[in-house]
A protein has these predicted regions:
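Intrinsically disordered, low-complexity boundary segments flanking structured domains
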Residues: 10-11, 45-47
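Structural scaffold elements adjacent to functional motifs in cytosolic proteins
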Residues: 40-42
Length: 121
């Protein structure tokens, strides 16, 4: 019975896959978003976004209950999503959620606080 139980345990882990996304520094993130096919996504609050954001970034607040619903409506599955938050914490949560649904995600690991590029208000 023990070998069978171990086999079942092992097989259950095979079905679980961690959500994969790339976490990059600000310089690499800037290079990534130079590609005009990459979608820029700000996952902060509306008030944070209004204070300044990366140009052409969409806003979907990851703390809202309808985050995934809005993401599925606005983000095409065939595009790379480059996302960020203020410090890198919320963006990791958003990156995991999106990657789990099959999106290709690149996340700014140190957040907007480390951004030295152009800012739009």
């Amino acid at each position: 019975m023990k070998p069978f139980s171990l086999l079942l345990c092992f097989m259950s882990f095979l079905g679980c896959k961690a959500a994969d996304f790339r976490s990059v520094d600000a310089d690499t993130f800037e290079q990534v978003i130079e590609d005009t096919t990459v979608i820029r996504l700000d996952v902060r609050t509306a008030s944070e976004y209004a204070q300044g954001h990366i140009p052409n970034a969409l806003l979907i607040d990851v703390t809202q209950a309808d985050f995934m619903q809005k993401a599925e409506q606005l983000l095409p599955m065939d595009k790379t999503i480059a996302l960020y938050c203020r410090s890198g914490r919320r963006s990791k949560t958003a990156a995991q959620l999106l990657a789990k649904q099959g999106y290709q995600v690149i996340e700014l690991n140190t957040g907007f606080n480390s951004w030295k590029g152009e800012v739009e208000k």
